[in-house]
Amino acid sequence: MMKEVRIDVTKQTSEELELAALHARLIHQFNQSAPFSDDWWRLQKEIFKGKIGENSRVMSPLTAVRPHEVTIGNNVVVMNGCLMMSAGTITIDDDARIAANVQLISNNHDPYHREVITCKPVHICKGAWVGAGSSVLPGVTVGRYAIVGAGSVVTKDVPDYAVAVGNPAKVIKWLDKTKFEDK
């Protein structure tokens, strides 16, 4: 079972608050920069503390909380309008695709103590594709080369090579794994 981390947001240190303010400023600058400009590339690396792989890009606008908890592999594309709530960490492996307006949410509020956030990692595995407008919730892994259909709400793990759709997302078919070559 995945360990849950709990954070009381009323007890943030001054350093944590300063880091949050820095991230907000960097993301604002990123969202105002011309895509693919030198500033845009520099800010992208700075936002993710260099944990973004070769030939990867995150398109603006981006909304992110604790982006230093996000790791992005090589050859990843994250399209416009992505929300990354990453207190529980978000990992996006090589060759993954995140379509427009996807929400990657690794934290939630405790239903009885709302000043406490509960955190579990989100993992998007190699070659996975998360369709437009989908939400991936805390503790979920989207498997290798899996597809999440547009508008889905993913509350449980999606197995490797599965196609899952709906709210909540359910597996509707399987991809032929022999059609995928690891690069």
What residue spans do the PLM features occupy?
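Conserved catalytic-core motifs of eukaryotic protein kinase domains, centered on the activation segment
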Residues: N108-D110, R114-V116, V140, W174-L175
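Left-handed beta-helix
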Residues: E54, M59-S60, V65-R66, G73-N74, ...
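Short, glycine/charged-enriched secondary-structure capping and boundary segments
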Residues: Y112-H113, C119, A162-V163, K177-F180
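Residues at secondary-structure transition points
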Residues: S14, I47, P67, A87, ...
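Glycine-rich, flexible loop/turn motifs
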Residues: L26, D110, T118, V154, ...
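Short linear capping/connector segments at secondary-structure termini
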Residues: W41, S60-P61, D110
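Terminal amphipathic alpha-helical/low-complexity segments used for targeting or macromolecular assembly
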Residues: M1-N55, A169-K183
